[in-house]
Amino acid sequence: VTRPSFVFILADDLGYADLGCYGGRSACSSNLDRMAAEGLRYTDGYSNSPVCSPTRFALATGRWQYRLRGAADEPIASRTARGNPVLGLPPSHPTLASLLRDAGYSTALIGKWHLGFPPHFGPLKSGYQEFFGVMSGGVDYFRHCDSGGKHDLYEGDAEVRCEGYLTDLLSERAAGFVRRQKNKPFLLSLHYTAPHWPWQTREDAEESKRISNIVHLDGGSVQTYLTMIRQLDEGIGRVLAALEETGAAENTLVVFTSDNGGERFSDNWPLVGGKMDLLEGGIRVPYIARWPARLPKGRINRRLAITMDWTATFL
């Protein structure tokens, strides 16, 4: 039996009704809507937490996040976690990436890590053979600096300077990784920072210069937020196109979800609450899965599921 490849796409702070296939009122998610039509859409998919890092711990380990000390910080904050040998995913702990790597898979994380900082923690220490992305919880999309103004863009274990809109950089790297795989199964964890603050589209380079505090309350609008989702969706379209071009699409399980519910400017209708709330709007998120070789098209699944179920499914 030919082993499938896996592409796990994680959005950041996406609301339950932000996508057209979940009732969104704006046409900003054509590729994800098509992916849902070609596969399976869950109505009752939940994130492991209403905030970032704990959900990522659960996804990486397949376990309840609070079995690890680092997940008790909700989320891991740059100001307290840099250099801290405790607040992170222990390299000795088995992960989805390490187990698939040991089974012969190529593994890459493109995007957001947020499970502890070097030198104690990092994607390459936890099963990923390639990494391009950010270590912290939120960065400026153009300057690639965290909320404290520290540069945060890495290639492997080393900081790297790149020009460009972060969502586009991640999409390009992810599509490139897919194209480089030759007759070998792979795990691509594509963990976008969008549409997490700061709210910037690829047309907002000047806004990046204006904003001095990237956290939460400076900048943004509903229209900016929707454009961020559209540009995220365009990037996902490029990755799906790369799967088609290489002939890998048929036997690749592609999953899309969010790490928690939506925050400011998002649409969580008809749910109550949002990010940081242990209410439906904070933990009920979009779940889309496409696997042409195995999953029927256009199905709606109303069973309960949680983030770490995907880990068990892949393994």
Language-model regions: role of each:
Residues V1-L315:
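Formylglycine-dependent sulfatase
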